[in-house]
Regions:
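Feature recognizes metal-dependent phosphohydrolase scaffolds
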Residues: 1-274
Length: 274
């Protein structure tokens, strides 16, 4: 069995609950498709849990891909990791990650540093620029979590089997079998709208909530979306609705399942009126 999860977004309780339904014995594998952070209240703990899981089982059994939210965070880290660097055009863009996080109560940052450090950053925010605050915050993170940041930076962008492509957002399908050469990082991490239709391999992705426009177009739909051709989407918007999706692929019978309460529910083509 190949399991897949995506877009956990700091929801640790839901992740731990879903993991009770994953069996990693034998040749079974688990693939995480990215976006482990932001929105939820436990970004660091989710990353730590997945990192430890991979260390315990190995990176051939637990495959961890990078999502666009990890990349945005890492872009911010990389722009400000030198405390003496002048703000570049890129850093002026990426300090917006911190500004956005502060607008949401520093929901992600506070999971990486102490409350005392958060209060210090809030205090200097009254008089300092976002560039200066970013440099301070990045040094705080690196002082305690440099190894985790290194791990995050080296996460792959896709995982390929003989019949499937697991990726955070999607690939350039116009490139056909040369997709791995023709797909940009921006597409792998942020493709929108979600692709549908026939492709020579099955694409399993997250990034786009399954109930959103272009997929189910139904705000009450939070199950796995299958287009009936070559695409499975597994982002159930857990941070909004509390439902983390778990896909299971049985390599023996070539069937896909949505795993709920340890039940394997066959995934069928989405029909708007069913």
């Amino acid at each position: 069995m190949i399991y897949a999860m995506s877009d956990i977004h700091g929801c640790l309780r839901e992740l731990k609950d879903k993991m009770t339904q994953v069996d990693l014995q034998g040749d079974n594998r688990l693939i995480f498709l990215g976006d482990y952070m932001d929105y939820g209240i436990n970004s660091f703990k989710v990353l730590q849990y997945i990192w430890e899981l991979q260390k315990n089982y190995g990176d051939e059994k637990v495959i961890v891909l990078k999502g666009n939210h990890e990349q945005m965070f890492l872009d911010w880290i990389n722009d400000f990791r030198n405390p003496y660097a002048d703000g570049s055009a890129e850093s002026i863009l990426f300090y917006e990650w911190l500004e956005t996080d502060f607008e949401h109560g520093a929901n992600t940052l506070r999971t990486f540093i102490s409350e005392e450090q958060i209060n210090f950053l809030k205090q200097i925010a009254r008089t300092c620029s976002w560039e200066s605050i970013s440099r301070e915050a990045v040094q705080m993170i690196l002082s305690d979590h440099d190894e985790m940041i290194w791990w995050m930076q080296h996460l792959p962008l896709y995982y390929e089997t003989d019949a499937q492509i697991f990726v955070h957002a999607g690939v350039d399908e116009a490139a056909g079998e040369y997709w791995s050469f023709g797909t940009s990082e921006n597409t792998l991490l942020g493709k929108f709208p979600a692709a549908k239709g026939k492709f020579y391999k099955t694409v399993i992705a997250g990034h786009v909530g399954t109930g959103t426009w272009g997929l189910a177009n139904d705000r009450h739909f939070h199950d796995i979306f299958y287009d009936g051709e070559s695409h499975y989407y597994i982002d159930g918007s857990v941070y909004k609705h509390g439902k983390l999706l778990l896909l299971g692929y049985d390599e023996k019978n070539n069937r896909y399942y949505q795993i709920e309460n340890s039940r394997q529910i066959p995934v069928k083509k989405f029909e708007r009126f069913r």
